Amino acid sequence: MTPQAFTATVVGSPRIGPKRELKRATEGYWAGRTGRAELEKVAATLRRDTWAGLAAAGLDSVPVNTFSYYDQMLDTAVMLDALPERARQVSDDLDRYFAAARGNSDVAPLEMTKWFDTNYHYIVPEIAPTTKFALNPDKVLSELKEALAQGIPARPVVIGPITFLLLSKGVDGAGAPIERLEELVPIYAELLSLLADNGAQWVQLDEPALVTDMCADAPALAEAVYNKLGSASNRPAIYVATYFGDPGASLAGLARTPVEAIGVDLVYGPDTAVAAVPELAGKTVVAGVVDGRNVWRTDLAAALDKLTTLLGSAARVAVSTSCSTLHVPYSLEPETDLDDALRSWLAFGREKVAEVVTLARALRDGREAVADEIAASNAAVASRKSDPRLHNDRVRARIDSIVASGSHRGDPAQRRASQDARLHLPPLPTTTIGSYPQTSAIRKARAALRSGEIDQAEYERRMKKEIADVITLQEQLGLDVLVHGEPERNDMVQYFAEQLEGFFATQNGWVQSYGSRCVRPPILYGDVVRTHPMTVEWISYAQSLTDKPVKGMLTGPVTILAWSFVRDDQPLADTANQVALAIRDETVDLQAAGIAVIQVDEPALRELLPLRRADQDEYLRWAVGAFRLATSGVADSTQIHTHLCYSEFGEVIGAIADLDADVTSLEAARSHMEVLDDLNAVGFSNSVGPGVYDIHSPRVPSTAEIAESLRAALRAVPAERLWVNPDCGLKTRNPDEVSASLKNMVAAAHEVRAGV
């Protein structure tokens, strides 16, 4: 059967629901408030509405199997029967799935890390020597049948075998998972046959790993694998999707295989990639010309120019997003506070689908058919270029002056001596990363302030009570360096964005970070200006309640960029320095208020690292420079902390050392302290706090378990440089879990401290 050609599609779509319905349903299930039937009903409704909306908008190929209760890599591990043995002990299939993702009282969760250079986190499959791959196609077949029954032109989407293995982790003495690629090819061939038998005309196999340098043999592997899969006698047409950058030599390799379509990211990859591969002349090129991971409106005229150049290089050209719209909010419609100019510059998920359809129509019927849409796009482009909010001469001049004079602090040993004399901390000092649980009282107060039920003064009174409670709790637990708990902050980036010029904070711009965790990235559209202190009053109040040091808590410039939708009209380095200047001014004001410890978090340092090694040094140069610009305005006696989240730390370990923070805390529990060896390898000599327990899991670690982690850390870090802290902030945990875990952490620190 000849597959029906398609002209307009998207790589994938969000699954959390336009009002975060899936978040509420899964959290209700985890808490035991609702049952499986209720959860599955919500999921089915979300799938139905998503598919219907995409088809109604004009897509003639709709991705399915992009829904997930937690994560698509975990879904693929289930499909390949590759869950670890410890999770298999759970008899119920859904509870087994969630145990692998989140852990429970008996099962440690799988590791979690960033999905390429995005802020989405995926669950890392473990491939052991005992892992026996086998096909479990129930989910993908079920969703295909659902969609076809609904009359949807459905295209199942599955993570491809190369990407699955390159993003998995070998355990228990296993070699690199990619060494087992040959075992997966017949399983994928079996899947293709089942999909064809159940009515799929097309299948999309996602291979974003091909745009990275993760495997030098990737181009050859891609050609070999897709030659075999493309030669299968019973299969749908195959569309191999690459995204997040340039597939390089893999593009030509794929073009030499029998697959029918290849997706290319023409937003984050070069426009010339397709023209350089003559073998594409017989293929459908799925052209990712609409940015799937940022919120700026597409310049339709420029995108059409790109598409037109492709027409002579491919048998067919289909229009698509550059990647899944999982990474952007659902729609601009709820954003009623947007001014007309800013609104005209933006496109969220629904608007991006409309852009794809418009561009496909222009290719089919000519530019005249979409003349009004092109005119509106041109007007938005012109409006954005001329808006005065995009340029502040004073900020730019200050940055130039500071950078020219150098952004360096004093000698680390001298700083440590000065800080020791000021702080008088014991060996293995205990602390937490920053946030404490956002209680129902906090959320109610925030909602009451928004609705006008309470005024700002009453809101501040309630937040100060929360701060006082957190300070009291920490003193009772015996922590050494305290935090104020951040009750006043809705989000560690949005809180600052709401107080800085150049940002717009959305009302409903939610995107998935991991599992049920959703974030609302602000939009950074203009030059960044700090007009007033943002945290000093809250931190000073917390410090007034205790004789122990309270950390000032700030978010670093790279993380603010990584977790925002950032302007694309100037280099990221320039924008990072503008944010860094605002943070620098805040650190100076905190120091003037008597705060002796200031934490500038950079959990997303690894996130923005370019996927190709050739581009990485330049990024790390300006990322480190921005952090130093933010932190070099304080005295040697002020202790600067930073915190970094799950990532492949080894790739940026030199940059972590170059940040030159006095204390660096890192997520390390799930990866079993592996990062400490990496730090030692680059001669890291400042203090470090490797996370001693995993806060992403609801399980409470025992004192013995934490003590064991501390002793493991002491084998790599001397006691005088080792701090004791959880993996990350505690915002998403419940208060009982936090108290029990921290009690055990402090007890473990005392136990180990006695022996050093």
From Swiss-Prot:
Binds 1 zinc ion per subunit. InterPro entries: Cbl-indep_Met_Synth_N, Cobalamin-indep_Met_synthase, Met_Synth_C/arc, UROD/MetE-like_sf. SUPFAM superfamilies: UROD/MetE-like. Pathway: Amino-acid biosynthesis; L-methionine biosynthesis via de novo pathway; L-methionine from L-homocysteine (MetE route): step 1/1. The active site is at H696 (proton donor). Keywords: Amino-acid biosynthesis, Metal-binding, Methionine biosynthesis, Methyltransferase, Repeat, Transferase, Zinc. Pfam families: Meth_synt_1 (PF08267), Meth_synt_2 (PF01717). Its EC number is 2.1.1.14. Its cofactor is Zn(2+). It is an enzyme of class 2 (transferase). NCBIfam families: met_syn_B12ind (TIGR01371), PRK05222.1 (NF003556). Belongs to the vitamin-B12 independent methionine synthase family. HAMAP family: Meth_synth. This is 5-methyltetrahydropteroyltriglutamate--homocysteine methyltransferase. It comes from Mycolicibacterium paratuberculosis (strain ATCC BAA-968 / K-10).
